[in-house]
Amino acid sequence: MNFENLLIEVGTEELPPKSLRKLAESFLANFTEELTKAELSFDSAVWHASPRRLAICINQLALAQADKVVEKRGPAIAQAFDADGNPTKAAQGWARGNGISVEQAERLKTDKGEWLLHQARVVGVETKSLIADMAQRSLDKLPIPKPMRWGSNTTQFIRPVHTVTMLLGSEVVEGELLGIKSDRVIRGHRFMGESSFELDHADNYLVALKEKGKVLADYQARKAIIKTDAEAAAAKIGGVADLEDDLLEEVTSLVEWPVVLTASFEEKFLDVPAEALVYTMKGDQKYFPVFDNAGQLLPNFIFVTNIESKDPQQIISGNEKVVRPRLADAEFFFETDKKESLEARLASLETVVFQKQLGTIKQRVERISALAGYIATSINANSEEAARAGLLSKSDLMTNMVMEFTDLQGTMGMHYARLNGETEAVAVALAEQYKPKFSGDTVPTAPISICVALAEKLDTLVGIFGIGQAPKGAADPFALRRAAIGVLRICLENNLPLDLVDLIAKAQELHGENLTNENVAEQVLEFFMGRFRAWYQDQGVSVDVILAVLARRPTAPADFESRIKAVAHFRTLEQASALAAANKRVSNILAKVEGELPAAIDDKLLVEEAEKALAAKLAELQPQLAPLFAAANYQEALALLASLRESVDTFFEDVMVMADDEALKNNRLALLSSLREQFLHAADISLLQ
């Protein structure tokens, strides 16, 4: 079989930078899936992407499908021939459909009978005749939320398409993609190199684009160049560039020929909080800020231009002129905001509605303040500081800086709190109240920050559930799932002695008559149980372990964590499987019992040696188990209970639980109930698989 390399490039107008990687990856994944479905072998596949092109390269692609033999079974011999041995109409019709005579058919014998058989040789289709349709289907499946039309064309795509190149080796693959006929014309850089050129061979794609078109189509190579050059440029001025990957990806997706340059701004702007300057540089201008080795912002930034200029200083000056007014705006906002304290801004919060049924932001911060102070008493934090931080937690929403740069909420509150003479703990709590903001984000660890972050999230959760607006399906407009996971993570990672039932009840009390949902407490608790499951599944904990703990509905996150660890460890023990099965059996037996069981085991009614042994073993363990469960030492308790395996196995082998004698039966049921109760102090291990 022969092989060739395939190139498919779609040349477009500038593609959305934040979608570029996903589009290219999806294009490649869709096309390789098509190749697999078509049974076309290939060695490897890669994608390339730049602002004006999506491309895929398939290496060592088979030039045709392999020939194959397809077995087509006909009627059974009994139905294929009549009593005289002549072919029936069924046999003749089947043979005719396969282009043969009945006499040419083979026989297939199995242990179930004998059938007519035709082994048809199917010649593989040439790859080049399949490529265009496969590529079009691959493009049709791209994740494009809002496709657009252009010109008089009815074709839709994420951006207007100008060129399509499909080369199998040196041969142009005939066909159209998105209404554009395939040829070998490739468009180069918009301002440098050849505006377009003909590509002679698929293998030369990257080299020709680089040398003729002044385009680095290899996305990863382009990203690596930007990163390396930016690091070198920062080091040259004694700093370190902030090369956050999301911004690095976006910049990589904005340029086809990256040139890294260094610029500066006036040092006076460094009096403005660094976060505001960084937000402006990164968010608005796509610049990389530069910090010194101590983490202090330098009056420099690194940017990437898409052209190799003969006068780079002119480009540098241009970018400095562009960023200066933005930094000046930040400076003005900061200086203006400093004239009014966070406390003085509390009155203005009365004019802003948090949610129609839940009142104003002023009412919200009063609730957060009270709840933060309440939480502080449970974790030995300063309740006055916690209440103060809660009260000031939303004042920065009324500042010019946050109104202009909304992502700086909390952060600017911290800076203004410091300027207002608030304690450092209060100031930091304002910045950390929204943490964790995303998966993988850190959680607050300072006591006052913990109190405010928990109060802020619980107020939202209980309030929104309390007015009947719980998340439905994928919709979660108030980010309640994130808030609930945040509460759990803060409690778990700080090992806090807090109970969700208590926290929910206090938050509900503070909302007062605002809440119309009578079942709010139970619904919020159930929501937390769902978040427990999601959180631990993401951590790789087995679902059956999670369900075993959830069955007991522990409402203190730290306690939940202890149970999870204990059950996960128990599951690794040799005795676990047998004891889980025994617990399941006990659970099923007890579920069928009608009426109440004896409160205690009557030793006089223990007649079989096996039940005596089990009762004795349980009695021996109970004094040891009680303090372990009281201390939430579930792992050691379950390890002790694992020693019951032999006694339990022997009991079920030798003892008839449902004895005819009612007293014996009830006593044995009481024994099993006592056994199960010990395990249930930790979890329902009958749910372990």
Curated annotation (Swiss-Prot):
<keyword id="KW-0067">ATP-binding</keyword>
<dbReference type="InterPro" id="IPR006194">
    <property type="entry name" value="Gly-tRNA-synth_heterodimer"/>
</dbReference>
<dbReference type="InterPro" id="IPR008909">
    <property type="entry name" value="DALR_anticod-bd"/>
</dbReference>
<dbReference type="GO" id="GO:0005524">
    <property type="term" value="F:ATP binding"/>
</dbReference>
<keyword id="KW-0963">Cytoplasm</keyword>
<keyword id="KW-0547">Nucleotide-binding</keyword>
<dbReference type="Pfam" id="PF02092">
    <property type="entry name" value="tRNA_synt_2f"/>
</dbReference>
<dbReference type="InterPro" id="IPR015944">
    <property type="entry name" value="Gly-tRNA-synth_bsu"/>
</dbReference>
<keyword id="KW-0648">Protein biosynthesis</keyword>
<dbReference type="GO" id="GO:0006426">
    <property type="term" value="P:glycyl-tRNA aminoacylation"/>
</dbReference>
<dbReference type="Pfam" id="PF05746">
    <property type="entry name" value="DALR_1"/>
</dbReference>
<comment type="subunit">
    <text>Tetramer of two alpha and two beta subunits.</text>
</comment>
<keyword id="KW-0436">Ligase</keyword>
<dbReference type="GO" id="GO:0005829">
    <property type="term" value="C:cytosol"/>
</dbReference>
<dbReference type="GO" id="GO:0006420">
    <property type="term" value="P:arginyl-tRNA aminoacylation"/>
</dbReference>
<dbReference type="GO" id="GO:0004814">
    <property type="term" value="F:arginine-tRNA ligase activity"/>
</dbReference>
<dbReference type="GO" id="GO:0004820">
    <property type="term" value="F:glycine-tRNA ligase activity"/>
</dbReference>
<comment type="similarity">
    <text>Belongs to the class-II aminoacyl-tRNA synthetase family.</text>
</comment>
<keyword id="KW-0030">Aminoacyl-tRNA synthetase</keyword>
<protein>
    <recommendedName>
        <fullName>Glycine--tRNA ligase beta subunit</fullName>
        <ecNumber>6.1.1.14</ecNumber>
    </recommendedName>
</protein>
